[in-house]
Amino acid sequence: MEAERLNAIESSLADLRRRAGELRGYLDYDVKSERLAEVNKQLEDPNVWNDSKNAQALGREKKSLESVVTTLTALDNDLRDAQDLFELAHEEGDEETLVATESDAAKLEARVADIEFRRMFSNPADPNNCFIDIQAGAGGTEACDWASMLLRQYLRYCERKGFKAEVLEESDGDVAGIKNATIKVSGEYAYGYLRTETGIHRLVRKSPFDSSGGRHTSFSSVFVYPEIDDSIEVEINPADLRIDTYRASGAGGQHINKTDSAVRITHMPTGIVVQCQNDRSQHRNRAEAMAMLKSRLFEAELRKRQAEQDKLESSKTDVGWGHQIRSYVLDQSRVKDLRTNVEMSNTKAVLDGDLDDFISASLKQGV
């Protein structure tokens, strides 16, 4: 075994241990470990459920604490195992064990980098699940087809990230594609990863719907907002709501269309409209739609406060959701993010959900 190779592995493992130690400090590992023990003790008390609100709050706190403590504990254990394996390979001159150590070090590097990346999630709602609203812009069939391509893109992205994605509502276009759709994304830091996707997405291509092969430009809007749990109070006056039921269309199978199971709720003071047709049960669709409305109202209030703050900071650029953020030019094989200038030439991969470079850059630059 060449000394240079051994030194490289040893140096890599030492660097990983150093970075893991920094993460323990930054994420308050010791404090969170102690607090987790306290919370577990409180939850073991049979009387804890006498106060259900407090018990639920403790349950949420436990989940949050465990996400840090469990992750860093497992990382430390695996780093220790990798170091032991390296020392064994070194002592015995075992090539196969050394190769295994190199593989372990590479996997640990990816894990440490992922935890470091998550330090950029500064929004209080970043750990939450989220909803993605996709709306076709003007342009008829071409715009509706573009909206359906974006729907597929985000479903594939969620699949890559290990998120659960559920299409709650989908309205078909008159000829092809979709007019609009809503996806619920469930997973750790779903909103944190996806929130910078809010904005206008522009497509330029030779249209398959134009027999002359002309070049067309289409727009679709994407709006991402966090799911809000029951611990956050959002007042909704029932008198402010108009609730309509209708027969579902699009995904859902034939049976779903036989009853008025789909639900549309309009919040009249703000004009916010939410729809859900995912379930055969009108009751469950109504509950999901109310959860969506609560999240939309909470997000609207946050954006209102942010807008007021931005007025005081004239150096800030417009971060309103209605601005163009990304351009997809298919015949030139170019997808460019207009905020970060990140560009990719593999348009097929991007449309298949390969958005990591764009999302990483937008989070690092704080767009």
From Swiss-Prot:
- InterPro entries, alphabetized: PCRF, Pep_chain_release_fac_I, Pep_chain_release_fac_I_sf, PrfB
Where is it localised?
Cytoplasm
Keyword Magnesium among record annotations:
no
Q: How is it modified after translation?
A: Methylated by PrmC. Methylation increases the termination efficiency of RF2.
PANTHER family from the xrefs?
A: CLASS I PEPTIDE CHAIN RELEASE FACTOR (PTHR43116:SF3), PEPTIDE CHAIN RELEASE FACTOR 2 (PTHR43116)
Q: Which GO terms describe its molecular function?
A: translation release factor activity, codon specific
> What job does the chain carry out?
Peptide chain release factor 2 directs the termination of translation in response to the peptide chain termination codons UGA and UAA.
**In the UniProt entry for this protein, what further remark is given in the free-text comments?**
The gene for this protein contains a UGA in-frame termination codon after Leu-27; a naturally occurring frameshift enables complete translation of RF-2. This provides a mechanism for the protein to regulate its own production.
HAMAP family in alphabetical order: Rel_fac_2
* One GO term of the biological process aspect: viral translational frameshifting
Keyword match Acetylation? no
Q: Main subcellular localization, coarse class?
A: cytoplasm
Modification N5-methylglutamine, positions: Q254
Q: Which GO terms describe its cellular component?
A: cytoplasm
UniProt record similarity statement? Belongs to the prokaryotic/mitochondrial release factor family.
Keywords (alphabetical) are: Cytoplasm, Methylation, Protein biosynthesis
- Protein's name according to its UniProt entry: Peptide chain release factor 2
